[in-house]
Each structure stands twice: as structure tokens, then as C-alpha cells.
Amino acid sequence: MAASTMALSSPAFAGKAVNLSPAASEVLGSGRVTMRKTVAKPKGPSGSPWYGSDRVKYLGPFSGESPSYLTGEFPGDYGWDTAGLSADPETFARNRELEVIHSRWAMLGALGCVFPELLARNGVKFGEAVWFKAGSQIFSDGGLDYLGNPSLVHAQSILAIWATQVILMGAVEGYRVAGNGPLGEAEDLLYPGGSFDPLGLATDPEAFAELKVKELKNGRLAMFSMFGFFVQAIVTGKGPIENLADHLADPVNNNAWAFATNFVPGK
């Protein structure tokens, strides 16, 4: 007997393809046929190399078998989870949220570390442009002028700055977690859309799915960049742009290996 496929129009199954096929033993036995249903799993964007079982893997064709729980449903899934951090669905959902949020902060932070130095090197009077030195200006006699302009924000108390940061960032994070704030409600806490997408970049589902991947790829790079900026600040005492300029001027003596050897015992 030929297997049959049908779509149920009941509201409970609306939009889901259901495969109804008899088991072989049932056909060959008494001739009685029992129908089995198989609900198709949701797939990623059609033709996208970043989603689904055939997506790009972390080592390309040498990646091996991916864990069963990494199905390529979510952006940034390259099938790599050696430590099993994503095995638990709740932990996986939480880690996805943390990664996206930290990626966005890292991208903003990396821009904030680099941009003032670029402006200062191109003749813009910026006060202290190096990111880790700028904040310490608040301990000077004159305090800290935002953007080097005393008419904007003239900060003189580190406690006042700390309290302001806690209040403002606490409010923003509270709105994000609750999914409700001055800009309205959000159905998706990670990708709220609406007022947060004034250019309508997420209107097309295919383009939106690809933008999610691009955001995570750039965010992961930004997190590594911020870590590198921290290490540079400790080791060289200079900002990222100045370190880059020194390396380009003398790559032999200004590189990670040369600075690492300075910490060899007895040197």
C-alpha cells in the first residue's frame, strides 16, 4: 500500500506538515493499516550556509560530528561545544542571551576605545583620549570634562558617577529583562525590533537571519578585542591605536612576543 502524506487543517496542527505512513509489519501482517504521524521540525532560512545540518562548521570539513543538541537552529552555531555547556536547554538559552548582550557591549566598548584615539591623532582636542586613562582624570584637581568640554558634563565625584551608572544601567537592564519599557513591549527580548529597528533592517526574514549571524561574529571578535585592549593597557601602558602605530613603525621590537619576554624571570 502506498504511503500517504496529508496536511491537517485543525487549528492545533495549523502550518505543520504531517506524514502519515503505515509500518511495514502492519502492512504485511493482517492487512490492517495503522497511520503514524511525524511532525516536521522547523528549518533555518532556505539556502543559508549558516543554519541547518549542512551549515558551516568550526573546522570546515574536518569538524567531525556535532553534538545532537546543536542542530543549527540558532545563529552562530558552528557545531562546537567541547565542554558541553549547551547540553541543558535552559542553560543554552541563558548562555545565548548572555553572549548576545555581551557582544553588543563589547562592540560599543571597542568603538569607544578606538574612536577617541583616532580623533586625537587627527588633531581633535580631546583631553585624555586613551580609554583607560580618561576615567582617571576625575581624580585630578580639575575633575573630568566629558569630551574635553567643561560645558557638557563636569564630573568631580567618582561616587556620583558610580551612582549615576548604577541607576541608568539598572533601569535599562530592568526594562530589557521585563521586555517592557518607555519604547513599548517586546515579544523577543534579544531582538525586540520596533523602535529598536528604525531602518526596518529586520523586515525581511532571510536578511534578518543573516544579520543575526553577522552580529554574533562581529560581537565575538569585539569581545576578543576588548580582552586584547585590557592586556595591552597592562603590559604597554598605551592605547590600541598607539600600540598599532608602534608595531607598524617597528614590528620586530613591538609585538606580543617581544613584550612577553620582558616578563621572563631573571630578565
Swiss-Prot record:
In the UniProt annotation, what is the result of changing L199K?
Loss of targeting to the thylakoid
Q: Where in the cell is it found?
A: Plastid, Chloroplast thylakoid membrane
The residues listed in the UniProt record as binding chlorophyll a 2, with positions renumbered to this chain, are H102
- Keyword annotations for this protein? Acetylation, Chlorophyll, Chloroplast, Chromophore, Magnesium, Membrane, Metal-binding, Phosphoprotein, Photosynthesis, Photosystem I, Photosystem II, Plastid, Thylakoid, Transit peptide, Transmembrane, Transmembrane helix
Pfam families with a match to the protein in the record: Chloroa_b-bind (PF00504)
Topology of the protein relative to the lipid bilayer: Multi-pass membrane protein
Residues annotated as binding chlorophyll b 2: R104, V153, L183
What biological-process GO terms show up in the record?
Answer: photosynthesis, light harvesting; response to fructose
Residues that hold chlorophyll a 6 according to the record: H247, A256
Q: Which residues bind chlorophyll b 4?
A: Q165, R176
The molecule here is called Chlorophyll a-b binding protein 2, chloroplastic
